[in-house]
């Protein structure tokens, strides 16, 4: 293979991996760790919003 062809193959691999990584940040393609983090954050916020002193200091509860 010539240098030009190797460069084109390299660019195709980089492009394909960047598209795959971009998809990983969306809903059903999200990793289990991301989903777990979101669920934990929702649980903490729900508990905080049910507590009046915490809800008063947290703008997400309003």
UniProtKB/Swiss-Prot annotation:
What keyword terms does UniProt attach to this protein? Acetylcholine receptor inhibiting toxin, Disulfide bond, Neurotoxin, Postsynaptic neurotoxin, Secreted, Signal, Toxin
Task: Output the PTM entry.
Answer: The toxin is inactive on the alpha-3-beta-2 nAChR when the disulfide bond connectivity is C1-C4 and C2-C3 (ViIA-I) (IC(50)>10000 nM).
Q: Which GO terms describe its cellular component?
A: extracellular region; host cell postsynaptic membrane
Q: Name one Pfam family in it.
A: Toxin_8
Q: Which cysteines are joined by disulfide bonds?
A: 48-54, 49-61
Name the propeptide positions.
19-45
Q: Tell what the record comments on domains.
A: The cysteine framework is I (CC-C-C). Alpha4/6 pattern.
Q: What else is known?
A: Negative results: does not inhibit alpha-2-beta-2, alpha-2-beta-4, alpha-3-beta-4, alpha-4-beta-2, alpha-4-beta-4, alpha-7 and alpha-9-alpha-10. In addition, it does not target dorsal root ganglion sodium (Nav), potassium (Kv) and calcium (Cav) ion channels.
Please state which protein family the record places this protein in. Belongs to the conotoxin A superfamily.
Role: Alpha-conotoxins act on postsynaptic membranes, they bind to the nicotinic acetylcholine receptors (nAChR) and thus inhibit them. This toxin selectively inhibits nicotinic acetylcholine receptor (nAChR) alpha-3-beta-2 subtype (IC(50)=845.5 nM).
Task: Kindly provide the name given to this protein in its UniProt entry.
Answer: Alpha-conotoxin ViIA
